[in-house]
């Protein structure tokens, strides 16, 4: 178990990751770009604006499944490495019960489990970083400390580097290295897995076929695993040829939130909608394990020096408030066009812990976050019982200029068939974002440029029963 001086591993990137919702859900929702704040009749849309849950006219059961490809192209020192991962993708499962009309009010109740985000991603890059070594940072951070005091001072990797003979100390606690850090080839690999799913209890009501109101109690849960392998290979030196640092991090969490929404239908086919999302109040459980290996000129390998916090620790995260506005034009039974705007107030996120000190994280949130703006647009064309859909969304980064993260774009195309009781829909989407990747602390580390693309293919089947 580590001493209380340890610097905990939560980061502003974790806050950004767990605060973003990409709504990987039903095929109809994704096919029209997620622009459903003023529309409804879709389970994934109910997680966005629960007022649209009142648009369902019949009891319905729906299931969305498919596949997801995650690709990364990373450029460093003139070379590019490409990684591709593919696998199964759950989108949504939902049930709505259309209750009998009472006194002019129509009520729907139900539940839905929706995919909110997918964290699956792998990134690999390598290249010459001559004169720039992680050992430089470890030596600088160790200066003035007795090696036996490094752990108590929270300098875990510095302690591991000393124990692994990557650094050495003289009697005055000045640190040096036997590695040839003027001739360095660095290799960086990060493998991320997991996602966020949200279970919601939904209710909605409709009055006079004009006003729609709804609410949702959301229970999101997160599973996230990150494995990083960072290696340096040195030219000829006194004794050290290379080292590997392996970092394993696991985070799981469950929370709750409340969503409220309203919609209004005008006589001329226009519809307007608005929704407010409270923060998701998460309780996170986290654990990690690091290993360091050192290789020497004689071919020997030092047994790994392992640093483990043996018991998982907990911390709390409150994600940002979110506000949504939408307007759409419905062309009778021919289709619709729709536009949404969403404001994600990243600077309202907060963190705390009763057992560890993570005050620095709120300071980073205040210093490095900004408002994130999302615009979604979509259209649906009806051809008798067949439907064609297209959509686009644009999102600005919630991190300010201190982080080189580009805006996120997503385009989608889809189609569907709607019978009397059975509907089948599919969608293919492409979501792209970019960011600078630092191998370690940005103050010391070289950076690579990464382009990340997600390509979900989702099928939805819905079955309706009864009549209202």
Provide a role label for each language-model segment.
Residues 1-13:
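Bacterial Sec-dependent N-terminal signal peptides
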Residues 3-5, 51, 65, 390:
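Residue-level signal for alpha-helical transmembrane segments in multi-pass membrane proteins
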Residues 10-24, 98-468:
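Outer-membrane beta-barrel porins/channels
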Residues 27, 39-48, 54-130, 194-197:
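Outer-membrane beta-barrel translocator/receptor signature
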Residues 48-49, 445:
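Short structured motifs
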